[in-house]
């Protein structure tokens, strides 16, 4: 039997075991393959099993492929706008950003040290502006049930300098980590906020990598941390948007 003689549903099921990128390439081969490759059967498999949690009535009329592209092209704000979710278009892997409001930041509600501000280039309503602290501590947690299985993830602190610049970070290294809360072993790295470790992002913000973590098939909680609590030197002048968690292979 010729492959193209198979029922469209069967072809769609086979295509669903490839990747979103491959499905788009297959759809360009012929009209029959395009119909199968663009079908809800194919794209249902590329969507997260819990995707219905992230959509409202305005998205309910979308086809599965349209939903997938919507998740990839425009991050969704959930949990009262404190968390951002999207998917990587080529692989369909899940990506997240926890806003500053979602993080545990020491002294963040003390206006002499931190202030909450709104700026136009943030995806969240509020970001945390650091005035000055001697104890710099930011922590966040996420369940691996929200991440893609069998995937190596990295976490990044997303920030920018205030207009007058930052201070105190030049000579004080930050201790950063990305680890399971089950382990008692702290494999912290030291990085400098103002050095070659920071990277510019397409959205105009900066980021530093906190670490890597392989997400297997067990559900557990993982923690991200950024600390400078040893030296006690005063530091300030940055704006924290949040912590982003995305697959390591995405550059």
Curated annotation (Swiss-Prot):
<dbReference type="GO" id="GO:0030246">
    <property type="term" value="F:carbohydrate binding"/>
</dbReference>
<dbReference type="Pfam" id="PF00646">
    <property type="entry name" value="F-box"/>
</dbReference>
<protein>
    <recommendedName>
        <fullName>Putative F-box protein PP2-B12</fullName>
    </recommendedName>
</protein>
<dbReference type="InterPro" id="IPR001810">
    <property type="entry name" value="F-box_dom"/>
</dbReference>
<dbReference type="InterPro" id="IPR036047">
    <property type="entry name" value="F-box-like_dom_sf"/>
</dbReference>
<dbReference type="InterPro" id="IPR025886">
    <property type="entry name" value="PP2-like"/>
</dbReference>
<feature type="domain" description="F-box">
    <location>
        <begin position="1"/>
        <end position="46"/>
    </location>
</feature>
<dbReference type="Pfam" id="PF14299">
    <property type="entry name" value="PP2"/>
</dbReference>
């Amino acid at each position: 039997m010729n492959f193209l003689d198979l029922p469209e549903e069967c072809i769609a099921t086979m295509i669903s075991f490839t990747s979103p990128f491959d499905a788009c390439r297959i759809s360009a081969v012929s009209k029959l393959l395009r119909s199968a490759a663009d079908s809800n059967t194919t794209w249902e498999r590329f969507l997260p099993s819990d995707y219905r949690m992230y959509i409202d009535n305005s998205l309910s009329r979308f086809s599965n492929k349209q939903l997938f592209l919507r998740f990839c092209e425009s991050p969704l704000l959930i949990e009262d706008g404190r968390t951002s979710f999207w998917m990587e278009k080529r692989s369909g892997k899940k990506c997240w950003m926890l806003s500053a409001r979602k993080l545990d930041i020491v002294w963040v509600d003390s206006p002499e040290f931190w202030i909450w501000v709104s700026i136009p280039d943030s995806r969240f309503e509020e970001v945390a502006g650091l005035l000055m602290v001697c104890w710099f501590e930011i922590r966040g947690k996420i369940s691996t049930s929200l991440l893609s299985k069998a995937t190596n993830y990295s976490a990044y602190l997303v920030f920018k300098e205030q207009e007058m610049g930052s201070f105190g970070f030049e000579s004080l290294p930050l201790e950063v980590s990305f680890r399971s809360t089950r382990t008692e072993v702290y494999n912290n790295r030291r990085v400098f906020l103002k050095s070659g470790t920071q990277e510019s992002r397409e959205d105009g913000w900066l980021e530093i990598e906190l670490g890597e973590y392989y997400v297997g098939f067990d559900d557990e909680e993982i923690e991200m941390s950024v600390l400078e609590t040893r030296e006690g030197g005063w530091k300030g002048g940055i704006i924290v948007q949040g912590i982003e968690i995305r697959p390591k292979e995405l550059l």
